Amino acid sequence: MTTKRTTTDGELDFLASYDATRFPRPSVAVDVVLLTVRDGAIWALLGRRDDQPHRGRWALPGGFLRIDESLDAAAGRVLRTKAGLRGVFTEQLYTFGAPKRDPRTRVISVAYYALVEPATLERIATAPHDTGLLLARLDVAWRGETGGPVAALDISGEVLPLAFDHAEILSMAVKRIRGKLDYAPIGFELLPAAFSLRDLRLVHEAILGRGLNKDSFRRRILDRGLVVPTGERAAGVGHRPPELYRFSDRSATDV
């Protein structure tokens, strides 16, 4: 039951005369880390900045929060306008608020991360018109959830210069998805609806940055009931096609 809040005359008078310029008002931005997995690595969608500051550097898709929208709505708007995506798995990641993270003014960034099948991001990054977008491979030099530097590499393996503190945001996103692998179906959005346990294991290995024992992985996934068999087998995969599975629960938030 919701209790209706009443506004007193004193509060109305206070609000009517309130000076919104009394305290500094930092800008708020929303940046989205769009991640996928392919070829044994984590990849992220980046865009080249056309304007100052950091012109020519690569940045996460983002934008400033509008005065009349929620943070989740802003993240959804960024996905639609910068990447043409709707209804993908998206979760709030972290708030980055170092005073000098943006040379223009005080800008607080609320970061989100989104998980997308590789084909989707490849299609966006290789669109026939020049979108200024690039699918970058993430070079993660640390193990587990310790955190540390993350470099973004182009297709030739060259390190891409990143704008603002976006390398730190990428690092936090990798740390988050590594930490969630044990209790959430992170791979759901990174795989087709039906997949083999090998497909799922390769996704986990790419995220963790290390190999996994095949039998132990299979046993752990099946024992926890994270996936259920579809009753079908993969087509065109030799004499003994693998059994296909689907996730039993989609614990994701769409924006």
Where are these regions (language model features)?
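N-terminal leader/linker segments that precede catalytic domains of diphosphate-processing enzymes
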Residues: M1-V255
